[in-house]
Structures are given as C-alpha cells and as structure tokens.
Amino acid sequence: MKVNDRVTVKTDGGPRREGVVLEVEEFSEGVMYLVSLADYPAGVWFFNEVDSQDGTFVEPLSQ
C-alpha cells in the first residue's frame, strides 16, 4: 500500500473503518501506516507486523 490508497483499519471492538494512507514507514518488524479517518483527519498510526495475520491492522479497501 502507498500514500493516498484507500484502506480499512481494524480498531478495538468495532467494525473496520475506512481511511486514506497519509504516510508509510517501513521497519524490519513490519510497516507503519499513518491513516486519516473521519474523526481523526490528521491521522492515526497503525502497525502491520511481518508474518502475523493477527498483527495486520491495515488492509486495502475492497472495491
């Protein structure tokens, strides 16, 4: 995923939320995405862990 991609994010206890990627930072353990959400337009950081389905919080929006 890259900047300006539309995505969904997993949050605590609720349904997945739609947003837009503002920034991407890669690390050896995974990738961090700054995602703009309706109630957080400046963005919230989410971390996708490498090789862990449970640690995947950001996914591309299915069209």
Curated annotation (Swiss-Prot):
InterPro entries: Dextransucrase_DSRB. Signal peptide: none annotated. Pfam families: DSRB. Belongs to the DsrB family. This is Protein DsrB. It comes from Yersinia pestis. The lineage of its organism: Bacteria, Pseudomonadati, Pseudomonadota, Gammaproteobacteria, Enterobacterales.
